[in-house]
């Protein structure tokens, strides 16, 4: 079943070359919808209780090196798989009907397969393969369908992410060799790695190697410079997929690999990572406030929110870690809605400059309402999806360091300011004469945006729909950190951070 979810979009993408251009959007949306229904089927029918991973499937690929096709999921993987499937469907459904869409739709389906592989792989060589393969379709989407400087943006994106991944590959090979030294056989099986005792000094170097790969993808300061440029040049569908899922590959890597594999290093360097995250939050918020382009505001807002996610992850406790994963889902939904909205107004007005608008609420009331809902979620208003993840992430980091929580909370206030100022400048005041003829949202656009708005409200009111299923898997990560730590002080600190914690 899991292998079907991983490879169904890729196989369908290959078959898509046989489909006529006029039918390709319907074909792609149908494939993405089937993929989403398969993911929901797993949510409803698979019991995750009492298991580290379910739906595991293993086939030996290179026996001499013990490399295998080994996949399996827990609820952390599952929520990201559902998010990937949902946003792939929304992205294709929201495409304009004009132009040659065949290669764009095929690229999205290939990208969806690689994302499913990243969130399911339990063999590290397999994980690395899916990780690197995800670069190819997104590189093509930006380079072939982006704006004027799309080639430069695509190359910059590729160089940053590829070079970061090289460090991870070296670390993967080294840990495989450690297994050979201790047992006489190479192993890239994550479950074997969880049982491997790694000294504290080695953990630090290995943590840093993974940190470069995941930090570039997240992206952490100062590795973030590729992201605003990629967003600025990418087509709307590229920005949606980049913000909703691709960035989560980095934060997922920290949760799945860095914390449980290198618990002593994670605790030792948690302060360092949190300081970087706070710099990232404040810096991105201030830069966002200074932007004149709507899409760039959303891009820097995205960086700021990823910083809050990093604070939650490196709080090293159940509350913060659970909140960070919830915030991954929240950010994926909210940022996607905002990028879709910016893409819609760009199609009509052929500009994203904030100064070119004003008073749009009068001529586009439906557009203004949905943008308002997404803005409220972005600033973390209670009863929206944006509040829960931010609150839990900051509550978690408060247990680690009160100053980090205070600075993180202050930066969120700055974020509220720039988003509200953006909304005021675009939707209130006098409407320019050239914008009086702009058309409000049509049925197709509403069909893509309304589900996102419903999720923003529903999961803000009932966050336990995600939090409760997540709790056992998050607790499992914490337990692995405690049992695998080689330093007794690390065990005690993690235990004290998690005393009596529940999601």
Please provide the spans of the model-predicted regions:
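Transmembrane helix-loop-helix hairpins at membrane boundaries of multipass inner-membrane proteins
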Residues: 1, 15-106, 182-185, 501
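Residue-level signature of transmembrane alpha-helical entry/exit and packing/kink sites
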Residues: 1-6, 25, 81, 104, ...
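Central hydrophobic cores of alpha-helical transmembrane segments in multi-pass inner-membrane proteins
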Residues: 3-17, 29-44, 81-95, 111-112, ...
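Cytoplasmic/organellar membrane-interface segments at the starts of transmembrane helices
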Residues: 8, 364-366, 419-503
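Hydrophobic alpha-helical membrane-insertion segments
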Residues: 30-45, 161-173, 413, 451-464
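Hydrophobic transmembrane alpha-helices and their helix-loop junctions in integral membrane proteins
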Residues: 90-96, 113-125, 139-425
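Short phosphate-coordinating micro-motif centered on Lys-Gly-acidic
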Residues: 132
């Amino acid at each position: 079943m899991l292998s079907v979810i991983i490879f169904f979009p890729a196989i369908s993408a290959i078959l898509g070359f046989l489909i006529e251009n006029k039918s390709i959007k319907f074909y792609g949306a149908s494939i993405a919808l089937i993929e989403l229904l398969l993911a929901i089927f797993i949510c409803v029918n698979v019991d995750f209780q009492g298991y580290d991973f379910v739906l595991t499937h293993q086939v030996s690929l290179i026996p001499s090196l013990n490399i295998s096709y080994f996949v399996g999921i827990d609820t952390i993987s599952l929520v990201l798989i559902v998010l990937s499937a949902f946003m792939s469907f929304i992205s294709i459904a929201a495409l304009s009907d004009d132009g040659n869409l065949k290669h764009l739709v095929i690229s999205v389906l290939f990208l969806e397969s690689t994302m499913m592989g990243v969130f399911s792989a339990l063999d590290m060589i397999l994980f690395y393969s899916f990780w690197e393969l995800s670069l190819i379709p997104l590189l093509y989407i930006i380079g072939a369908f982006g704006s004027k400087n799309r080639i430069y943006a695509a190359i910059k994106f590729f160089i940053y992410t590829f070079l970061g991944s090289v460090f991870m590959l070296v670390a993967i090979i080294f840990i495989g060799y450690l297994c050979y030294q201790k047992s006489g056989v190479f192993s890239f099986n994550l479950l074997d790695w969880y049982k491997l005792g790694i000294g504290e000094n080695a953990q630090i170097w290995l943590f840093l190697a993974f940190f470069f790969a995941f930090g570039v993808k997240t992206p952490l300061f100062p590795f973030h410079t590729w992201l605003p440029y990629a967003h600025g040049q990418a087509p709307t569908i590229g920005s949606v997929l980049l913000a909703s899922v691709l960035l989560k590959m980095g934060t997922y890597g920290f949760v799945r690999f860095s914390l449980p594999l290198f618990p002593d290093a994670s605790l030792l360097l948690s302060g360092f990572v949190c300081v970087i995250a706070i710099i990232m939050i404040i810096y991105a918020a201030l830069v966002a406030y200074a932007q004149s382009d709507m899409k760039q505001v959303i891009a820097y807002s995205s960086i700021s929110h990823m910083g809050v996610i990093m604070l939650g992850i490196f709080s090293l406790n159940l509350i913060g870690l659970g909140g960070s994963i919830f915030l991954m889902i929240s950010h994926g939904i909210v940022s996607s809605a905002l990028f879709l909205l910016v893409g819609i107004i760009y199609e009509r007005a052929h500009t994203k400059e904030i100064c070119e608008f004003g008073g749009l609420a009068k001529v586009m009331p439906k557009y203004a309402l949905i943008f308002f809902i997404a803005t409220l979620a972005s600033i973390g208003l209670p009863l929206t999806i944006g509040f829960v993840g931010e609150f839990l992430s900051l509550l978690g980091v408060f247990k680690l360091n009160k100053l980090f929580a205070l600075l993180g909370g202050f930066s969120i206030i700055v974020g509220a300011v720039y988003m509200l100022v953006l909304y005021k400048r675009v939707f209130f005041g006098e409407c320019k004469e050239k914008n009086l003829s702009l058309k409000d949202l049509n049925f197709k656009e509403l069909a893509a945006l309304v589900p996102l708005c419903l999720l923003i409200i529903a999961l803000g009111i009932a966050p336990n729909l995600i939090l409760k299923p997540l709790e056992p898997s998050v607790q499992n990560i914490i337990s692995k950190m405690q049992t695998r730590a080689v330093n007794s002080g690390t065990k005690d600190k993690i235990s004290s951070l998690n005393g009596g914690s529940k999601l």
